[in-house]
Amino acid sequence: MKKNKIFVACDTSNIKQVKKIINHTKSYKLIPKFGLQFFYSKHGRNFLEKYKSEFFLDLKCSDIPQTISSALYSIKDLKKIKYITVMASVGLKGLIAFRKQALKINKSIIVCGVTILTSLNDKSLREIVYKDKVEKI
């Protein structure tokens, strides 16, 4: 039976706090998830270069196919990325380009498509021109 993966969010730019989270949860075999805040922080990129276990990189990449593919190429040295996110709104060509480049980083990488941000609701979607309700997107 395949076990479900459980992730622990390391949503901080404080390197000491990230290390504390990882140390307190390592016996549970959780996979750390690093988002934009940590990745762009002073120590984020350097920490991930040296991190020896698999991790989830939650960057929610969103741009034209060539740009997201090039952005992934620039993090090719982060070999322990097991999961990475891309906004599904990049379109089919963007998703294909992203996955193709992601597999060059790690042959077993899992690309997760983000369809909608959890912070959005029907009203906020209407404000940015979406006509459908959240459940339909």
Regions found by a protein language model. Give the residues of each.
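Conserved anion-binding
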Residues: 2-3, 63, 67-137
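Conserved alpha/beta-domain cores
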Residues: 10-49, 59, 65-68
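Surface-exposed amphipathic alpha-helices with a cationic face
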Residues: 23-26, 48-52, 95, 99-106
